[in-house]
């Protein structure tokens, strides 16, 4: 009988990837606005291309921020600060086409149709939260490793350890799964990184394997059959926005769960917390993570849907993929008893009117151990256990 080997793959990209540059600029603008006006409404979008950054979208605020300077500072911080990169902080043209938020949308959000004391959802739509006990940070191993590879290559570049590296990079990790869908081994690693013209491909591959990949991968999951693809296309000198255009919201799977869970389609960066695309997705992750950490299931996905101008969710669904340790009706009861999914309740519970967003715009919004994010807190575990 033929038995098909099962695999799962996730990817991540560096802070210097064109789409991530756009995300970071959008969230840097949002943070600057929130620092002056915590009640600002923001839906900022950014495009990046050869020598150009375009900023547009909607913003309603009493704050004044220098959008052009924020964009230039963000680009420089990422590492685009040398003329040979083509796209640089000092040479880029920044255009600002931000307009004020529609009054129709504003009035729908300011006072919910079903509860005037609450904020209405900023739009219709559904969001998903997910957690798995596969890793200590409750993310799929493939995504956790892909993010770590991107942070590691940033670190060796910024430290000057590999001074020929340039900011644009991508990583992808594939694992083999056993009959119980548990990770049995790492099957393949793909890592592509931009570099100077001076380095040979052989030298780059040797250095990246030794200083970037090997320190990150769990050695107990690596074997003689693990395949490494390091710059498999060969030369990668021209990169970043000089080679590819970038846009906010095009890395939503990298930002969330690496393909292990559903996605409602709404992106995060540039949006303030009245946008349930962002705030409710964060809260859904918070709920899922606390439920899994409390032991109700090995992995759990939560879907929440909203109507524009209405506070209470239209629907809430919980999926445990056959891993529940208690009755699923009990899980739903616990969730309803402990967690309030109305937008204003979410904003207040997670304290989301603060300038905390730029730090999330690269290397993932979830499972972060390098920064302190309120939706990653495990402060509801004891309450959940008491109700189990």
From Swiss-Prot:
CDD domains: S-AdoMet_synt. This is S-adenosylmethionine synthase 1. Its main location: cytoplasm. Homotetramer. It catalyses: L-methionine + ATP + H2O = S-adenosyl-L-methionine + phosphate + diphosphate. Binds 2 divalent ions per subunit. The metal ions interact primarily with the substrate. Can utilize magnesium, manganese or cobalt (in vitro). Its EC number is 2.5.1.6. It is an enzyme of class 2 (transferase). It comes from the Eukaryota. Keywords: ATP-binding, Cobalt, Cytoplasm, Magnesium, Metal-binding, Nucleotide-binding, One-carbon metabolism, Potassium, Transferase. The keyword Transferase applies. Mostly in Roots. GO terms for molecular function: ATP binding; metal ion binding; methionine adenosyltransferase activity. Mg(2+) binds at residue 11. K(+) binds at residue 45. ATP binds at residues 17, 168-170, 233-236, 244, 250-251, 267, 271, 275. GO terms for biological process: one-carbon metabolic process; S-adenosylmethionine biosynthetic process. It is found in: Cytoplasm. L-methionine binds at residues 58, 101, 244, 275. It comes from Pinus contorta. Catalyzes the formation of S-adenosylmethionine from methionine and ATP. The reaction comprises two steps that are both catalyzed by the same enzyme: formation of S-adenosylmethionine (AdoMet) and triphosphate, and subsequent hydrolysis of the triphosphate. The keyword Transferase applies.
